């Protein structure tokens, strides 16, 4: 079954999180997300607000311990921003972010993949 992907706010930046098949936290910036996540936009927005306020203190100086991907368009293609030396597990993530990440379980581990095509069986 294919997951429907949709961008909640075309033309605007937004962040959302997922957990990969190995239990690591993955951050996605911009681009589309699984449509069912959009029913939880209040939680996604709360997590993004938390991240904006506390990420520098929580995650430390760059590079952050996150598998982070960004999208520069409406297509479900995300490119990696960095490869963390010691990636953060979902169980170690702040509660606001972990609640959102737990809603989207990726079927694969991001590992050292540089490009994620969400419409290619990842979600």
Kindly give the residue locations of the regions a language model identified.
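Low-complexity intrinsically disordered segments
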Residues: 44-123
């Amino acid at each position: 079954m294919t997951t429907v992907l949709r961008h909640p706010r075309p033309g605007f930046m937004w962040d959302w999180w997922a957990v990969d098949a190995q239990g690591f936290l993955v951050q996605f910036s911009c681009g589309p997300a699984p449509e069912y996540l959009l029913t939880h936009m209040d939680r996604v927005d709360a997590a993004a607000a938390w991240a904006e306020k506390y990420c520098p203190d929580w995650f430390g100086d760059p590079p952050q311990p996150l598998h982070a991907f960004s999208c520069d368009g409406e297509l479900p293609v995300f490119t990696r921003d960095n490869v963390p030396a010691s990636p953060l597990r979902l169980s170690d993530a702040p509660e606001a972010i972990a609640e959102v990440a737990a809603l989207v379980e990726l079927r694969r581990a991001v590992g050292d993949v540089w490009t994620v095509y969400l419409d290619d069986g990842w979600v």
